[in-house]
Structure formats: C-alpha cells, structure tokens
Amino acid sequence: MRWKSSFVQGLVLVSIVVLGTAAVHAQSEAVLRGQLLAPDGSAVADQDITLTSVSTGTAVRTKSDSEGHFAFQRVDPGEYTLSAAAEGFATEVRLVVEPREVRAVTLVLQLRLNETVVAQGRVLPLPSTHSPSSTTLTVDAVEGLSVAQRTSLPDAIVTSAPGMIRGHDDFVHIRGEEVALNPMINGVAFWENAHAVFSSGVSPDVIEVANVMTGGFPAEYGNRFGGVVDIVTKSGLRMNHSGGLTINAGEAGRRSVLGEFGGHRPRFGYYAFGSVFESDRFLSPPDPDAIHDHGSGGHGFVQIDGDLGSAGSLRAIVMGDGSTFDVPKTPRDVELRPLADASEQTRQQTAIVGWNRASPNQTVGASFYQRWSRVQLSPATGPLTAIAAMERQLVTLGGKADITRLAGAHSIKIGIDAVRLRPDETIAYDYAGFRELSELLGVPHLHITDDTIDFDGRESGGQVSGYVQDDVRVGNRLTADVGIRLDRYDLVITSTHVSPRVNVALDVGAGAVVHASYNNFFVPPPVEGVLSSAAGLTERIEEIGEALPPVQPTTEHQFETGASAPAGPLRVGLTAYFRASDNPVHTTVWPDARIYSYASFDRARAYGLEARADLSTLARYGVTGYFNYALGRVYFYNPVSGGFVTEAEHLEPGRFLAPMDQTHTLTGGFSYHHARSGLFGGTSVEYGSGTPTEREESAATSVAEPDQMGGDRVPGHFTANISAGIDLMRAGNRRPRLSLRLDIENFTNNLYLVAQESEFTPGQYSIPRLVSFTARVNLQPR
C-alpha cells in the first residue's frame, strides 16, 4: 500500500540521521543581532554583551566587533535580558524573541551610578517587524489550560489571540478566513488542516513556544494567511533527564493519560511524549445532549537533537497521531432512524529532519519532511439516512533550505521550498434515504440525479517556492521587513504568483511603537477534497445542473496598522486591518454527511479593529493575565468561481455576510501562583456576539430541533472557566513531585448554540458545565 511505502521511507530517513548524530545544540531557532553604542552615538568595540534567559537564568556571552556589532545565533524563543557594561557605563533591556526571528537591537550605554544601572529591565520598546500582530504562547500558557482543552491545537489556541472565532464543526476562523489555522512544526508547514474532522493534528503538549500570527508576516511563511502557528517543539536539550505523568478524569466521559520524558548527554538530546484520550462529547453536537458522540485517540512524538561540531546541528522528529470518533445525532435521529450511526477515523505519520550551521554572520539551514495521512468516513446504515462513505489519503514529501546573512544593518534571508503531494480520494454517496426523510418532515432538500454521487481519483503534483526578505534597521527608531515570494503551484490546476510584503515599525518614544504593513498573499486550493472539488460533481445536483471548474487559488491584499505602548504593568495594543480577497474559499458540508468539499467565491472583503492587553511584567510575582477584543465584519460575494456547492443561489451575483462574521469577540484570562504555599488558580472568559445563519427555522440535516433556531444570527454567549490547584512535595527550586488541579469549564452552565450555517448543515452546541480533576507526577532530575 502507498501509506506503508511512505511510512518506511520516513523511518529510513530518520534512522539514517539518528544513527549519524553525535550531538549537543539544537537547530538554530532565532538570531539576535545588534550594535553597542556609547552615549554620544559612537561604536563601542571589544566589549562583552550578555544574553540571559528570564525563565532559566542561563547566560551566553559574545563580544562586539570593531564597529560595535554583535550577534547571537541559535537563540531559543522566549524572554531575555540583554546587557552590556564598559568603563563606568552599562545598559540592560528586556525583549521577547519569536521563533525563527532575526531580531535587530541597538544597545546604548548609560552612566552607571553607584554600581547600579540606570535603566534596569525595561521592556524593549521597539518590537521587530517579524510578525507585529502575533501572540507568544509558552509552555506555561499551554499547561495552564485544562487537559481537555489540550486535546487539539484549535481548542488550545482559540482564545489566545484577538480575531479568533469559534465556528461550525469546531472550526476556528481568523479575521474572516475560514479554517485558516496553519501550524508550522519547527519551520515545516504541512498541508492538512489541523481541525479534528480533517486530520489527527498535533498535540499542544509538545509545544515549547509558539508564535500565533494573525496578520502580516515575512515571506518565508509562504502560501498561508489567516493564522500561522509557528511551533518550536520541546527538546531534551532543555531537560535534565526529567518528565512527568499526567492523569485526567472528568464528566462527559473525558479521560486522558499523558507522559513525557527528556534529557541530554554532552553531545546528544532526546525527548519523547505520548498521550491517549477519550470523551463522550468529542465533537460539538447538533443537540444540547450529546448523543452518539464518543471519540478516542492518541499522539506520539519523539525528537532527537544533536551537534555535529563544526558541521552544524541536527534535529530528527517522528510523530504518530490518530483518532476515531462518532458523528453526533439528535433525539429525533434516534427516534426516526436509530441505525444512522456514522463514524470517522483519522490517522497520521510524520517525519522531519532538520540541519543547521551557524557562523558569526551567517546561518544556513535545511529540512526534509515526509507525511502520510488518512481520513476515513464509515457510513450510517438503515432507512431515512444518506449512505455516505469517504476515504482521503495524502502523501507528502518535501524539502526546504535557507541562508541568512548579517551585513551591517541588514539581515538578508533567501530560501526555497519544494513539496510533492499525492492525494487519493474515494466517495460513495447515496442521498435517497435522506431525501425520503426530508419529504416526510417537509423540510428543504436537494434533487440529485439518481440520488447518487460517486468519485474515485488520485493525482500527483506539488509546489515550488522561493523568497528573499530583508530585516533592516534604519537608524535607532525605525525597522523594516521587506520581502518578495514566488510560488509555482501545480496540482489539478497550475498557477504562478509573486507576493510582495512590507512591514515597518517606528519607535515614537516613551516605549510606544507604531507599526504598519502591506502583505500580498497567495494560497493554493485546500488539499482536503482537492480532487473531488475539481471533478464537476455539481452537475449531478439538479438545482445547479452544471459542472463548476476546480477551486481557484486565493489571492489577497492585506493592509494593517496599529500601535502599542506600556500602561503601568500592562502592555496595550490596538490594530486595524483591511483584507481584499479574490477567490476566497469556504467549506461545503454534504447533506446528512460529514463529507467536506470546498468552493471558491468571487471575492471577499473583511475589516476590523483589535485591542489587546498583556500583564506580563508581574510574572515574577506569579501573576499573569491577558485581554483580547475584536470588532469585525466579513462579506463574501457571489458567484462561486469553482469547486462544489449545494445551494444554487451561490451561482447568482450578490453579497452576503460570511458565516464566520462575528461583530464582537472578547477573550481574557488571569492566573496567580503563590510560590510559598504552592497554591494556584485562574479564570478565563469568552464572549461572542453570534455568527450569521441563513435561515430562521430548523431545516434538519441532522434533524435539529426547530425551537433552538431563529433570528438572523445565533444568540450571543458569555462563558467562564475556573481552575484551582496545589503543588505538593516540593524541594527547593525543583518542580513539585505532585500537582493536583480542579477545572470547571463553562462555570455558569451557559449551553449555547455555537453556529448554524445553512439549511443543509446542523447547528452545533457548546459544552455544558463540566468538571474534571488532574493529577501530575513530575519525575525529578537525577
């Protein structure tokens, strides 16, 4: 079988690298460069500059050259202090380094008085232009979530950044882009969608740090927009033969077991993670009561890091993920068609090998990656139901390489990425039973020729991309990130596009920063259903009666401007954006079946305003907090330009509010950890004003209850989660040997309708109040 061949290829690739590795340092994650200046602006040569991790206290040093320039390679993402001292002068700043960032800093020495630095630990006022609209998600933030929220990446980050909206089928929409959540694993982007109905995803528990980018970002991030989650995974190089075992149990049959362990030798690092989970409310059900909604799955992850001395460093990763879950039903389904029990299975295997070599002014890196994934829908049976079977497989093989050169005020990065994709799809759909049910209930339904749609196809293709970008510092106050990207896509259709990107940031004084950006994006058709969505299957729908062309690539112009500034212990920011998209895509759910296809529309327009506040300066006192607010509007414009739809009105010109349009979205959180007693607690809140619905009463694809619908939008919602716990069996600065925690999700038991998109898709309901208990046993270093 194809997947077995690809699996063997991945294991052989990783085995060769692991056997040839004799290691110590991880692959380079970021570069920090800068210049040391005297108070009069002259360069300070041959002086020590120290970079110290705030979280670990680890310090590394380098010296400035004859022009005062310095550089730190292989910088792990996180918060640091950067300091220097010379002949009665000193300076120190604090800054946050993002994954794969090239950060430019100017250090200006200040007079030292009584051996005390005048400016101590201030937050660096000038952020990089790497991703101005981004949120850094640390391992502490991930572990602060309940275990149930860490089952999937979308659930873990949906409240982390402004502009993220919950949608139908547990999707996360970002700034008006549907299911635009694109994880990158150590610099490698795969094509599968991270949501549970599309793929097995990646476990949030392997995240060391992630940069959640919702606006503009450099050209290296490629054919993506909406939301890029740039993940740096955990490494044994940051662990001293330590780990832990976590056991979680709670209401709705939610149970999980997670374990991890990692460590390092003088020239070698290792890390392993594994988890299994199950739930009786796996997907958001079409009824307040979850019926036929059991799901189970697991994740496995192994990472080997090593150093080849002067030849560079290596990283090898193997991942295995899978889930099996039911398709939820309603009480009316149980009454009228008790045998209609569909289920879905996802499986995924991934291998990544990365190499990196750094010198004082240059970094070279390369990655090779492979993945096999499968999604299989097992059909419901019995009368009055659509009989829908579907299987999709995707084989991915690719490689990428880049070189970063530091030259004065410039950091120039050049890269190339080539990927080969081999999708395989089979669909067997019999609509007759559901048509009979619709006629029995007197609800709208389609007319499909012979009541059947069948498809069987496989294809090979891929994409080759190249980019150039320059992160340049213009004086002491202005930075710019300027880049251009070329993409050549060839799978079902062929398209070439050039994407320019410009991001600038200006320090206006007193710690305040103004930023602005223009980004042009090119995004190929989604890989899920890429073949069947291009097969002209709409000709079998009598209301449409014609074969639509394939889904078209999306192109977009995005404009953004904003500002941020300190306000007491807070860092506050405000951002405005406007997006103009051609051929935006949207999912189509087949009637009475969890088969997802895509359609591209004529164009879309989205605009909004986002506000955020972070309480990070009090972290050393055990206090953290954040607040996000988004005001947005999203319009889609007919007619459909390609793909598969079931509603004929989308073939006529017109404008409509997109299903992911939510006027007001608010999220926030606060936590406190008392170091002396070990007690900790926190709360998080979420508000949404409601997304549009295209109908005012039930039309029952899963036979939803009519009294739960109504209005042009689903009702707004406000929910709150609370948690409390204690760390026990502590010794000095070591992690506690035992941690106990209680979580209450949806504390007020506000069971709300998340989304109701159209007459052919069921609504989905949130979780009720659910209580869970977690115990974690930490393995102490030897």
Question: Which ranges hold each PLM region?
Answer:
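Periplasm-facing N-terminal accessory domains of Gram-negative outer-membrane beta-barrel systems
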Residues: 23-132, 148, 191, 205
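Outer membrane beta-barrel strand-and-loop segments of large Gram-negative receptors
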Residues: 58, 301, 396-402, 454-455, ...
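Surface-exposed extracellular loop regions of Gram-negative outer-membrane beta-barrel proteins
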Residues: 324, 329-332, 376, 429, ...
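Face-selective signature of the C-terminal outer-membrane beta-barrel domain
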Residues: 307-323, 345-492
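Periplasmic N-terminal accessory/gating domains of Gram-negative outer-membrane beta-barrel systems
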Residues: 89-105, 116-218, 223, 228, ...
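Gram-negative outer-membrane beta-barrel transporters
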Residues: 473-477, 576-580, 597-697
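Transmembrane beta-barrel wall of Gram-negative outer-membrane proteins
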Residues: 249-278, 288-325, 343-363, 406-408, ...
